[in-house]
Amino acid sequence: MSTYPGGWPPPQNQQSNRRLLVVLAPIVVLLVAAAAIGIGLLARNAAAEEIPGTATAAAGGSTPANVLADGAVRVGESDAKVTVRVVMDLQCPACKAFEEANGKVLEDAVRDGTAAVEYSVITFLDRAGTTEYSSRAGNAAFCVANSGVDGYQAWLSDMFTEQPAEGGAGLPDSALIDIAESAGYTDPAVAQCITDRAYDGYLRTKTDEVLNSGVNSTPTVTVNGEQVTDAAALMSPNGLAVVIAAAR
């Protein structure tokens, strides 16, 4: 996590000292806030700025079905002995790398009952594009979950396969609808939800809650509540399988 350069020059006299106290007080508050969430997630604050020509996030918003109270989508048996939680932003390149390395591990674990997986999709990377792709994709995550979770992991895999490069326009809503339909989400209500950004407000509320809980990077992965920090487990092919097996 990045940090700010430390230290300010000492005041030269009492008058300058008083001026510095006035000027530095709000700066210190800002620095403390930045240190608390990490420089990477400060981008989220700027991302709240309205981007001309795109939809604007609504306050509040509807609550989708098939989600936990904290907004995560749980896939797998309710009594699974192992619970894996993945916090992700669908525009995050490291999240794509994690999915490529361990997506099948998680699908297999759900299929054979070894583990349940809770996917917590957040948005803080709208600044990485020009059309608020991060939040549009996050909204789509709740649109498909609201319709059912049976195809959710396949949908996630397809979303990361089609993840756009940072800095561009991202995928249009029509492409998000196509990906959903390819994963089996053919109900016209899903397409309408994606176009209307029906869960945009809900997504942003849950994002705030996740960030306030102490998450400061994506992907953040936990197994039975213990954060996985080993890079090999996160990014090596099938690396998470060993961690899941050890937690059984």
What kind of feature is each model-predicted range?
Residues 88-90, 96-173:
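Structural alpha/beta surface segment adjacent to cysteine/selenocysteine redox centers
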Residues 75-77, 173, 182-183:
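Short hydrophobic/aromatic segments of transmembrane alpha-helices and their interfaces
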Residues 141-142, 160, 177-181, 191:
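Amphipathic alpha-helical segments within well-ordered protein domains
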Residues 2-52, 180-248:
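C-terminal cap of thioredoxin/glutaredoxin-like
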Residues 81, 137, 217-218:
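A structure-centric signal for secondary-structure junctions around beta-strands
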Residues 46-113, 121, 245-248:
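Extracytoplasmic low-complexity, Pro/Thr/Ser/Ala/Gly-rich segments
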Residues 102, 136-140, 151-155, 172-176, ...:
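Stable alpha-helical elements in mature extracytoplasmic
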